[in-house]
Amino acid sequence: MDDPGARPPGAWVRRHRTVYLCTVDLLRITGTGPLAGEVPISGSKNAALPVMAASLLADEPLELVNVPHIEDIGVMAAMLRHLGVEAERPGPGRWHLHAAHVQAADVGAELTRQMRGSLLLLGALLARAGEAAIAKPGGDDIGMRRVEQHLEGLRLMGADVTETGSAFVARARRLRGAHIFLDIPTVTGTENLLMAATLAEGITVISNAAREPHVYDLVRCLVGMGARISGAGTERIVVEGRGGAPLHGSLHHLSSDYVEAGTYLAAAAATGGSITVSGMRPTDLRSFTNKLRSAGCRVVEGASHVRLAAAPLHAVDMTTWPHPGFATDLQPQFGALMTQARGVSIISEALYENRFRHVPELRRMGARIAIEGRSAIVNGPTALRGTAVSVPDIRSGAALVIAALCADGTTEMAGAFHLDRGYEKLEEKLRSLGATVERVRSATPGQETRDLSGVIGD
């Protein structure tokens, strides 16, 4: 099926009229030693989702290149189609988005529950249609996500914004420029306010703005569509609004996924391997590669690649922080790596309070990890052993993949669909580096009413 979002994580299949089976993907990984080789890095999911939402701001086509073929992209495309956007995938890595006419201003829970990125539609839809109703999103349960800053920023721009028990609703006859100070440099909040500000009247200043690479990517796209924005990549972004006039079409090449690159580098380091990740910006990953060097790895950066040669690992401490600090999306992977390092490492999570969901599964594999508040204390090195584990979210799944690659025996990972939401061609890329990985689809009896975000079919 061409649209990755059209394939649900579990699909109901009718058998003999009365018996329903639920198909579930398992990832089976056998630890086979060091990874070696070169892996090309896919386009950034975190850049693709806001850029896709930005298509609502133009009445001409937006052509995207280097888009990863993952589940969340298909879900975003489905939401855009619901709003009346022409969303097509003409070829690998490409999307054609044309919002000539916005035909709806609401996105229901049947779509938004599948991922957190649905909230990115709020600012763009409000700016284009004058109203937006977005059912409260789903996605990874990694803790509180501060939505109030999005809403308050839109209110400062003149919108009437309410939060019901099930949705965020915003209306504005016209948006006006405002000076918005973010208490915390929220990435999604910065992106939402940027998109709303492009069509507002007057100048909007966003202070304490997020500086993540995908925010910069969104600004590049918006400027290519005719927006007037300065300060991207800094804490102060200035947007000169177009007074309601839509943006024009553009061709935009997405940046590569530094989180994917960091995941493969951590896997190579954990297995004692030597790999090159190519087609990415090493500067996006600098806080992570600096920690790898501190842990003993040999890391060399090129213009568009990073080469790592593993060495005996020693424990280092790490605290997540907004960019250019250590990315929270790489914290679970680094924690898995530290199970193979000599000594005690303290992994602290400053951004989300529920981002250690992988730890119980790592313990099942033999890891010695204690949780104290927002920190994980990792004692290493540990001889991990393969067993059955469950993937709770995307990045926790990546941590479990790393653990499985350096474990003795075979690990079976239930909930592999989480990995499909964030990693393109995961098995194929791991196999190219010498890993033993296979996907197993099993069928288990289930009830028709169980919610797997799936479909009932014959």
Model-derived regions, located:
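Structural preference for solvent-exposed beta-strand-turn elements
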Residues: 15-458
